[in-house]
């Protein structure tokens, strides 16, 4: 493979559309790329065609075709390689340089898209490898090659680049390379007259790939970040011996937004929402590797303790607990005590190593199979993980050498192999670390070296990882067509189909049909969503207890004016609650540099407790950008159907330089409907209309979720916040209109209403009728509008808008009103929506796919035309046939003569089916044309073949529903040393904390939740909003296996009081609250507002013990 066997030619004649010709040594003919289509040419046609082309590059191989935009695609050619050794007679080559050749333009592709430079840097970073021979596929381990014929999709990185070739029936094995990412290290060992090889191959999965602080934990499918399968391979003569180990991020929903050197602060998502992902990840391991054991190396410092406790609790709550051994080993702490501590860990792992064994074959005979693997992880799955995997590999190498019978007469072979492997494992750790963190591994041998690498990692993570992450996403997914269309297809179709079939990447028309017809196979599921926004004026009165008995957060969230959210009679609760808070902290210089999260945690806890008055809720996410904070809660019964949660934010203050103004956004998929929530705080001032419009435009443009998703990529969008749009009237005019209830006059002069009508902002968004008084600006703790010297005119600054982008979208506004909470100069606003989502079943989806595939015609769009009675098609007949095709509305993308016939590639399969109507026509009155399809059996070839495991990975199983069916979640203790380390709670919002010892400073009288309104005073002991330690009592009392009820409203029980949690009171007792000052402007009475006391406290009931965990038999071992 040292010779560049690929020659690439280009036709530079501007009179014709761009065209590329590719030739390869050892193959007759060539490939022709033209008009977005690909065709093979025979040798004679190639010789003729080449005369009008110029050679542009010689290459070692082709990775495939990558669509970088909807209108631009590039051919990716490998132009630089390094050989790392030979395995199975094949050269193993490391890619050191690539070149992109535009297929649709004549100029340089770098001028078309600036991302190409970053992508070229990624592909040339020496992390990609390929084999020179088809017979050895690097993506498969030795045992996998014996049991599977196809490549392992997890490690086949350029799989999507093959799709264009597969669409047009090109043999990819002959023309394209298969590359994997990771590390390949090969050494030669001489044993007497025989030569053997020792290799270490680490295959990085592409299913959830990214850089260190961009991608952590698991996604909803159970794929984890930095998942690496490492194969320790010994080859001697015809004998091969293979040992597999795996590593991967902790399979929970968590992230680590580290910006400091050595930072280990962790943000965990809702504990309960991780359960389905955890179950799916372990099911995948069982399906692919058989038995496995988990080795957790997390420590007890900072966020690692939080994450480690959550990991252990999750595993103990899983039905895998009795089947999968969980070995917990604080690597850093134990190794500081003694370097020999690793021996104790090896003793714990030894039974598993002995039981699982390794793969061994002689020639074509399988002597021994590996029956399981050890899964090792630390925080990054880098340094500590590599050390432990090295220990496992070295210990098992002795048995491998013994099986190969290499010690006979050569006493030192075992020692030589161990020395080679020790060196390979060290280099393997460096290479894996470089991919994920940007530097080599920290081995602990040199403090100066480790410190410099930590600093380099920090610079890498904060300055360069964003571009690298974008390059990963572009290389793996491309940008063939409308991202919203593809995103909707991903929500409807089983993931295995999207990953493994070219059809859904290459044929946009078919995907559009699938999305449009998805209601045919969907089961409607109506959910209720409460959306609220409140500018809390910097929390200036957050510690004021004087007025805490006057009003409650429940009057906002559960206001009687919004009885369609909560009704005592039928207990119809919202399924999802989204609450945005603006000016959570003072917008001063220090907070703009690093905003305190104390108020965020306090508000999160108070909203959580308020919700728990009615029913259990799970906190899905909480994110703060200086003063803007967004909270998202969901009922546990819908949690199994939530997926793809992501967070994004953008600063808009001072032209985007500061976060005193800005937006925070969440995205989430409910069943198959994608929903986006955006909380914004726009520019202030009576006349700064243009600035507010620009803030909206900036937010719409710059909010980006993973895989390039935008705000407009979603089915349903809720936009809430303090938009600061004013009313173009004087203060007296506004107040008089409020007194008279003349809101129509105010609406006519409302800036947001006017700007929407002009198409300057919130185009396409809807808003409920403004039938309540302006929400700004009030004197605090008063019903008086601003009486200060500035005397600002009242305005509807606080708004909630929405947009449903589905063709038959059914999002219904049930209520839109304000609440009378007076601790801020703004009044909170709330809205209740009924959103129709769709639950899609995998088996029904297969039926729809088959129907669409058949109706859309062959994806290659190719017809073969011949003249009856003539052995060769006469070229002069092409123009009249071209005219006939135009009459049908078909566009010719490419044509060629092949074996005497005319081959024509049309713009779609539907046009190919339409062209069959020309069969039997007579051209010129005498010549009869025959028309047939190149691929008449396309429907059978594209028929989806989904295993039960594929469908289980797509659908929510009864087991996963049961995992989230409990009404009492695990209870955690909180520690003040974790301030700012974590930001969201993992508790379900019901039940009570078990009695446990507390320090004297933290003890106080217990009060009921009903009397606890929003935060009124900073507690003596700050509680973080994520778990730090799981109490043993919580594990004993947590009920994880209760069945999840259907989404129908639960039956009412008016005789039963709402559940309440008994909490320690962090507030001091105070005198009775004084009456509020009189109102100078009589406001319309709040519809059905209630200011009475909350429901009475009920006795605390202990959760029942969990039922016996079901013992699930292991799946068939499938390596």
From Swiss-Prot:
Region ranges (Catalytic): 532-826
Residue stretches making up the SAC domain: 119-438
Reactions the enzyme catalyzes: a 1,2-diacyl-sn-glycero-3-phospho-(1D-myo-inositol-4,5-bisphosphate) + H2O = a 1,2-diacyl-sn-glycero-3-phospho-(1D-myo-inositol 4-phosphate) + phosphate
Region Disordered, residue ranges: 986-1005, 1042-1119
InterPro entries xrefs: Endo/exonu/phosph_ase_sf, IP5, IPPc, Nucleotide-bd_a/b_plait_sf, SAC_dom, SYNJ1/2_RRM
A GO cellular-component term linked to this record: synapse
Null mutant phenotype: Viable but small with slow grow and uncoordinated movements. Synaptic vesicles at neuromuscular synapses are reduced, arranged linearly and are dissociated from the synaptic active zone. Several defects in vesicle recycling including accumulation of endocytic pits at the neuromuscular junctions and accumulation of coated vesicles predominantly at synapses of neurons but also near the Golgi in cell bodies of neurons, muscles, hypodermis and gonadal sheath cells.
EC number: 3.1.3.36
Chief localization: cytoplasm
Gene3D superfamilies cross-referenced by the UniProt entry: 3.30.70.330, Endonuclease/exonuclease/phosphatase
Xref: PROSITE patterns: SAC (PS50275)
Molecular function terms, GO-annotated: inositol-1,4,5-trisphosphate 5-phosphatase activity; phosphatidylinositol-3,5-bisphosphate 5-phosphatase activity; phosphatidylinositol-4,5-bisphosphate 5-phosphatase activity
One GO-annotated biological process of the protein: acetylcholine transport
Regions of compositional bias (Pro residues) in chain numbering: 1073-1085, 1093-1119
Cell location: Cytoplasmic vesicle, Secretory vesicle, Synaptic vesicle; Synapse
Function per UniProt: Probable inositol 5-phosphatase which regulates synaptic vesicle recycling in neurons by regulating clathrin-mediated endocytosis.
Domain remarks: The Pro-rich domain is dispensable for endocytosis during the synaptic vesicle recycling, locomotion and for endogenous and evoked excitatory postsynaptic currents (EPSC) at neuromuscular junctions. May play a role together with the SAC domain in targeting unc-26 to synapses. The SAC domain, but not is catalytic activity, is required for targeting unc-26 to synapses, for locomotion and for normal endogenous and evoked excitatory postsynaptic currents (EPSC) at neuromuscular junctions.
Membership in a protein family: Belongs to the synaptojanin family. In the central section; belongs to the inositol 1,4,5-trisphosphate 5-phosphatase family.
PANTHER family for this protein: INOSITOL 5-PHOSPHATASE, PHOSPHOINOSITIDE 5-PHOSPHATASE
The protein's name in its UniProt record: Synaptojanin
């Amino acid at each position: 493979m040292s010779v560049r066997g690929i020659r690439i030619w280009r036709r530079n004649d501007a009179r014709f559309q761009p065209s590329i010709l590719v030739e390869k040594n050892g193959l007759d003919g060539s490939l022709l790329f033209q008009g977005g289509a690909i065709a093979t040419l025979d040798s004679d046609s190639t010789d003729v065609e080449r005369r009008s082309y110029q050679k542009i590059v010689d290459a070692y191989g082709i990775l495939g075709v990558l669509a970088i935009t909807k209108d631009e695609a590039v051919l990716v050619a490998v132009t630089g390689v390094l050989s790392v050794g030979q395995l199975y007679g094949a050269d193993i080559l490391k890619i050191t340089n690539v070149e992109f050749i535009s297929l649709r333009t004549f100029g340089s592709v770098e001028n078309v898209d600036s991302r190409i430079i970053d992508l070229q840097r990624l592909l040339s970073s020496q992390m990609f490898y390929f084999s020179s021979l088809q017979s050895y596929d690097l993506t498969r381990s030795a045992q996998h090659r014996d049991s599977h014929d196809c490549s392992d999709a997890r490690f086949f990185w350029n799989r999507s680049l093959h799709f264009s070739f597969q669409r047009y029936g090109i043999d990819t094995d002959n023309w394209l390379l298969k590359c994997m990412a990771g590390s390949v290290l090969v050494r030669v060992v001489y044993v007497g007259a025989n030569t053997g090889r020792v290799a270490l191959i680490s295959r990085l999965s592409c299913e959830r790939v990214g850089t260190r602080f961009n991608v952590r934990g698991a996604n909803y499918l159970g794929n984890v970040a930095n998942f690496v399968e490492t194969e320790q391979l010994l080859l001697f003569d015809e004998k091969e011996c293979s040992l597999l180990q795996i590593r991967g991020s902790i399979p929970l929903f968590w992230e680590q937004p580290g910006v400091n050197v050595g930072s280990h602060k962790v943000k965990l998502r809702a504990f309960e929402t991780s359960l389905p992902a955890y179950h799916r990840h372990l099911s995948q391991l069982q399906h692919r590797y058989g038995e496995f054991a988990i080795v957790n190396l997390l420590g007890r410092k900072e966020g690692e303790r939080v994450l480690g406790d959550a990991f252990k609790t999750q595993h103990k709550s899983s039905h895998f607990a009795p089947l999968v051994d969980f070995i917990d080993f604080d690597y850093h702490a134990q190794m500081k005590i003694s370097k020999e501590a690793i021996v104790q860990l090896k003793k714990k792992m030894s039974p598993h190593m002995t039981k699982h064994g390794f793969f061994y074959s002689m020639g074509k005979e399988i002597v021994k199979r590996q029956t399981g693997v050890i899964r090792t992880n630390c925080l990054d799955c880098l340094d500590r993980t590599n050390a432990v995997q090295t220990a496992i590999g070295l210990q098992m190498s002795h048995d491998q050498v013994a099986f190969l019978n290499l010690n006979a007469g050569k006493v030192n072979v075992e020692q030589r192999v161990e020395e080679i492997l020790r060196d390979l494992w060290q280099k393997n750790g460096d290479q894996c670390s470089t991919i994920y963190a940007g530097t080599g591994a920290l081995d602990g041998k040199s403090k100066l070296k480790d410190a410099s690498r930590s600093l380099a990692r920090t610079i890498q993570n904060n300055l360069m990882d964003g571009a690298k992450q974008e390059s990963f996403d572009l290389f793996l997914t491309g940008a063939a067509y409308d991202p919203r269309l593809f995103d909707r297809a991903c929500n409807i179709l089983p993931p295995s189909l999207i990953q493994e079939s070219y059809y859904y990447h290459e044929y946009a028309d078919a995907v559009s049909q699938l999305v449009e017809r998805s209601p045919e196979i969907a089961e409607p599921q109506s959910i209720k969503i409460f959306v609220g926004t409140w500018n809390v004026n910097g929390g200036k009165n957050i510690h004021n207890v004087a007025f805490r008995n006057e009003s409650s957060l429940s009057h906002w969230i559960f206001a009687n004016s919004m009885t369609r959210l909560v009704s005592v009679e039928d207990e119809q609760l919202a399924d999802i609650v989204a609450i945005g808070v603006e000016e959570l902290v003072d917008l001063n210089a220090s907070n703009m540099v690093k905003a305190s999260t104390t108020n965020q945690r306090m508000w999160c806890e108070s909203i959580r407790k308020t919700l728990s008055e009615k029913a259990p809720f799970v906190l899905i996410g909480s994110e703060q950008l200086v003063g803007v904070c967004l909270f998202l809660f969901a009922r546990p019964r819908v949690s199994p159907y939530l997926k793809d949660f992501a967070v994004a934010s953008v600063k808009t203050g001072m032209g985007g330089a500061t976060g005193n103004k800005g937006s925070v956004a969440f995205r989430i998929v409910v069943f198959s409907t994608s929903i986006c929530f955006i909380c914004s705080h726009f520019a202030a001032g009576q006349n700064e209309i243009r600035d507010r419009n620009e803030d909206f435009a900036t937010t719409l443009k710059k909010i980006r979720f993973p895989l390039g998703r935008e705000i407009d990529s979603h089915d349903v969008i809720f936009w809430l916040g303090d938009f600061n749009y004013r009313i173009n009237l004087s203060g007296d005019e506004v107040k008089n209109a409020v007194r008279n209830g003349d809101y129509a006059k105010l609406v006519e002069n409302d800036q947001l209403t006017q700007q929407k009508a002009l198409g300057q902002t919130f185009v396409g968004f809807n808003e409920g009728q403004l039938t309540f008084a302006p929400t700004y600006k009030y004197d605090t703790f008063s019903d008086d509008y601003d009486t200060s010297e500035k005397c600002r005119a009242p305005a509807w600054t606080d708004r909630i808008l929405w947009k449903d982008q589905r063709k038959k979208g059914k999002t219904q506004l049930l209520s839109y009103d304000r609440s009378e909470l007076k601790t801020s100069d703004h009044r909170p606003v709330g809205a209740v929506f009924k959103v129709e989502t769709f639950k899609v079943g995998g088996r029904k989806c297969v039926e729809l796919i088959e129907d669409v595939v058949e109706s859309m015609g062959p994806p290659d769009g190719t017809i073969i035309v011949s003249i009856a009675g003539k052995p060769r098609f006469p070229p002069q007949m092409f123009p009249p046939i071209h005219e006939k095709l135009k009459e049908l509305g078909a566009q010719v993308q490419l044509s060629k003569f092949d074996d005497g016939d005319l081959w024509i590639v049309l713009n779609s399969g539907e046009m190919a089916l339409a062209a069959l109507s020309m069969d039997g026509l007579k051209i010129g009155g005498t010549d009869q044309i025959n028309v047939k399809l190149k691929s008449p059996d396309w429907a059978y070839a594209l028929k989806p073949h989904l295993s039960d495991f594929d469908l289980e990975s797509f659908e929510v199983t009864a087991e996963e529903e049961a995992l989230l069916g409990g009404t009492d979640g695990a209870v955690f203790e909180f520690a003040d040393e974790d301030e700012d380390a974590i930001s969201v709670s993992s508790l379900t919002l019901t039940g009570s904390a078990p009695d446990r010892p507390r320090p004297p400073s933290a003890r106080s009288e217990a009060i009921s939740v009903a009397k606890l309104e929003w935060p009124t005073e900073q507690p003596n002991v700050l509680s973080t909003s994520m778990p730090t330690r799981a109490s043993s009592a919580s594990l004993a009392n947590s009920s994880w296996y209760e069945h999840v009820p259907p989404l129908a409203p639960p039956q009412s029980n008016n005789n039963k009081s709402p559940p309440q949690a008994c909490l320690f009171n962090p507030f001091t007792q105070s005198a009775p609250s004084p009456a509020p000052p009189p109102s100078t402007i009589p406001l319309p009475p709040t519809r059905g507002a209630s200011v009475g006391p909350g429901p009475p406290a009920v006795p605390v009931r202990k959760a029942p013990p969990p039922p016996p965990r079901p013992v699930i038999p292991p799946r068939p071992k499938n390596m």
